[in-house]
Amino acid sequence: MPALSRWASLPGPSMREAAFMYSTAVAIFLVILVAALQGSAPRESPLPYHIPLDPEGSLELSWNVSYTQEAIHFQLLVRRLKAGVLFGMSDRGELENADLVVLWTDGDTAYFADAWSDQKGQIHLDPQQDYQLLQVQRTPEGLTLLFKRPFGTCDPKDYLIEDGTVHLVYGILEEPFRSLEAINGSGLQMGLQRVQLLKPNIPEPELPSDACTMEVQAPNIQIPSQETTYWCYIKELPKGFSRHHIIKYEPIVTKGNEALVHHMEVFQCAPEMDSVPHFSGPCDSKMKPDRLNYCRHVLAAWALGAKAFYYPEEAGLAFGGPGSSRYLRLEVHYHNPLVIEGRNDSSGIRLYYTAKLRRFNAGIMELGLVYTPVMAIPPRETAFILTGYCTDKCTQLALPPSGIHIFASQLHTHLTGRKVVTVLVRDGREWEIVNQDNHYSPHFQEIRMLKKVVSVHPGDVLITSCTYNTEDRELATVGGFGILEEMCVNYVHYYPQTQLELCKSAVDAGFLQKYFHLINRFNNEDVCTCPQASVSQQFTSVPWNSFNRDVLKALYSFAPISMHCNKSSAVRFQGEWNLQPLPKVISTLEEPTPQCPTSQGRSPAGPTVVSIGGGKG
């Protein structure tokens, strides 16, 4: 427990003695921390993951994951402390119903406590203190708080830390408060940041001696003074660039812009694009050449908080050589909520590649739903589920006898997506989860390495389900490419590469017309969902009463599907793919039960008095 203290500092030892004592204490602390986290941290750092929380960079979070302890060690750096700071997690990044930890002062004494907020955002002391404060320290950079939190606490007021996206909330206290309950969240400088906290514990493979690097970077552009910008830049590979394997990539973020660069992707243009005009500018610019729309094959994707991405030692992603475009498109998403002006940037992605091709080519396969309006979400829904199938018939035909091995995944929906999950089904039984995000955000998409490689055999089924929220919409949301339309996709990265590039489904269009015919007969409203109209127009005409909603849900749960078992040429494998029955699932996976921490891992029931030294900030 930190020593009790007031704000004032006491006389100390000489500078040389203090420096020696400080360096010794830091060294001992790091040794203890590394030992406590052994097996969960790369050797070079006990806290390897870092993100800026606020746009100004005054709050920075570092962390590590201990799967043996089922806990996370957080270090929060407060560069300019005023009267305190608030940090925590909530379902979608709201201050309401949040799980919080708060450092505050009453003007005389500083306190640290586990807290929670109710539906109105009122903050309360949590009687079960699951954030364990380990150290408070002044450094040249500012004040650092080191604390520990279990993944799950079995406290109904707490957030369950799971695989996938976590919405972090933070707030800066500008003035003292007499008590925790007196803190008014509505008057705070608040913000949110999205991140994957539970990083996979995968050792970094050694790079081969012949590995080369290529930087795909923005050419010292000036970040536009607006909140959101997508910047596109075309890079051309050297003429005669032979076939290589990408084996690793990592972000290059211009120093000082860490809080502005939200995510980045590198795409390869379509093979038939033998020439693409050079371009550097906003992706929505009227000056953008149309040919850039054909640069959509993902080579690399990075999002805030992610570190380097490694391919398995036996596989690499092929690029260059015959049948491969020489043109790459970099897309950088700048998030500039403070509308900062005059900031130059050369961020991008560094590719590591080798001319010595590995045993297997890695491939990317699309799972989920076909981009079609026959799959729709009614308006004013809080959790409407759509499901796409990769059937046993397709995997039996398209996969090699030894199967494939999925090592990474990128989930994707548009604006109303809230959850995404892909489950592997074998012999009618849910076998394992490929990837799951219960707090998915369309504003935070990255290629994530899986904790465990998932092997898919011929005859297996892959089921991808997406949950949507359309509470703020008055009309049905149909499937399609538009940003106000919806998607449900899992781009899985696997090896060895096969001809199967797309394994997706949609409800049979004929059965959907039977739905429209049914509601025409059973609804008294003067509405015509007539077959001569487009499917989108038909959905627009539906009066969304409870009957029509329930019947649509039922239709999607039993009606036959149209399967798209497609090669990279967009041609389906030979076979009958229409009016296919839904795969049968006779048993499902049990929900994992969180481990409840012992009382030894908790702090005392009340606030902890802490020494933050150096005055009020």
From Swiss-Prot:
Report residues carrying sugar chains: 64, 184, 344, 566
What Enzyme Commission number(s) apply to this enzyme? 1.14.17.1
The cofactors it requires, by name, are:
Cu(2+)
Which Cys residues form disulphide pairs? 154-596, 232-283, 269-295, 390-503, 394-565, 466-488
Query: In what way does activity depend on pH?
Result: Optimum pH is 5.2.
Q: Give any Pfam family that matches.
A: Cu2_monooxygen
Top-level EC class: oxidoreductase
- Active site residues of this protein: 230, 412
Q: Which residues lie on this side of the membrane: Intragranular?
A: 38-617
Effect of changing residue 318 to S: reported as:
In allele DBH-B
Could you tell me which PROSITE patterns the record lists for this protein?
CU2_MONOOXYGENASE_1, CU2_MONOOXYGENASE_2, DOMON
List the Gene3D superfamilies.
2.60.120.230, Copper type II, ascorbate-dependent monooxygenase, N-terminal domain
Topological domain (Cytoplasmic) residues are: 1-16
Entry keyword set: Catecholamine biosynthesis, Copper, Cytoplasmic vesicle, Disease variant, Disulfide bond, Glycoprotein, Membrane, Metal-binding, Monooxygenase, Oxidoreductase, Secreted, Signal-anchor, Transmembrane, Transmembrane helix, Vitamin C
One cellular-component annotation, GO: chromaffin granule membrane
Q: Does the keyword Transmembrane helix apply?
A: yes
Task: Report how it sits in the membrane.
Answer: Single-pass type II membrane protein
Do you know which PANTHER family this protein is assigned to?
A: DOPAMINE BETA HYDROXYLASE RELATED (PTHR10157), DOPAMINE BETA-HYDROXYLASE (PTHR10157:SF29)
Record protein name field: Dopamine beta-hydroxylase
Q: Which gene encodes it?
A: DBH
